[in-house]
Amino acid sequence: VLSAADKTNVKSAWDKLGGHGAEYGAEALGRMFLSFPTTKTYPFHFDLSHGSAQPQGHGKKVAEALATAAGHLDDLPGALSALSDLHAHKLRVDPVNFKLLSHCLLVTLAAHMPAEFTPAVHASLDKFLASVSTVLTSKYR
């Protein structure tokens, strides 16, 4: 459960991304695909070469979904219900991939925002991403 301080940290960090959300989302996906090769089986025939439009486009979708989540911290299940259905029933993404992507996103944010990425912000973002992952995997059965 996110505390009031966690919610403040998440909203503040997300606000500081500015227009870089899609870029950081794509970078995090690239990190995940390179660091965890088994994740490459899920983005159905993505061209994973550097600068490819497919990971860039999916990175934008990831960033937009996380921005939606950051704006609805008190109702993550409601805000992410359609996305949870999509990943569980249509895409059938391995639930482990959400944890791996969360890790890669934390690394990406730390690399681009070192001054803002304090231990408290790190902990809050980690809890936030874990909560998002839990919601996205809630309809897997």
From Swiss-Prot:
Pfam families, sorted: Globin
Keyword flag Heme: yes
PTM sites of type N6-succinyllysine: K7, K11, K16, K40
Coiled-coil region: none
CDD domains referenced in this protein's UniProt entry, alphabetically: Hb-alpha-like
Keyword vocabulary terms for this entry: Acetylation, Heme, Iron, Metal-binding, Oxygen transport, Phosphoprotein, Transport
Residues bound to heme b: H87
Residues with PTM Phosphotyrosine: Y24
Single GO cellular component term: hemoglobin complex
InterPro entries, A to Z: Globin (IPR000971), Globin-like_sf (IPR009050), Globin/Proto (IPR012292), Hemoglobin_a-typ (IPR002338), Hemoglobin_oxygen_transport (IPR050056), Hemoglobin_pi (IPR002339)
Modified positions (Phosphoserine) in chain numbering: S3, S35, S49, S102, S124, S131, S138
Every Globin domain range: 1-141
Modified residues (Phosphothreonine): T8, T108, T134, T137
PROSITE patterns assigned to the protein according to its UniProt record, in alphabetical order: GLOBIN
Location of N6-acetyllysine modifications: K16
Any single GO BP term: hydrogen peroxide catabolic process
Tissue specificity statement from the Swiss-Prot or TrEMBL entry: Red blood cells.
Binding locations of O2: H58
Domain of life from the UniProt record: Eukaryota
Quaternary assembly: Heterotetramer of two alpha chains and two beta chains.
Similarity comment: Belongs to the globin family.
PANTHER family recorded: HEMOGLOBIN FAMILY MEMBER, HEMOGLOBIN SUBUNIT ALPHA
Role according to the record: Involved in oxygen transport from the lung to the various peripheral tissues.
Name of this chain's protein: Hemoglobin subunit alpha
Organism: Tamiasciurus hudsonicus (American red squirrel)
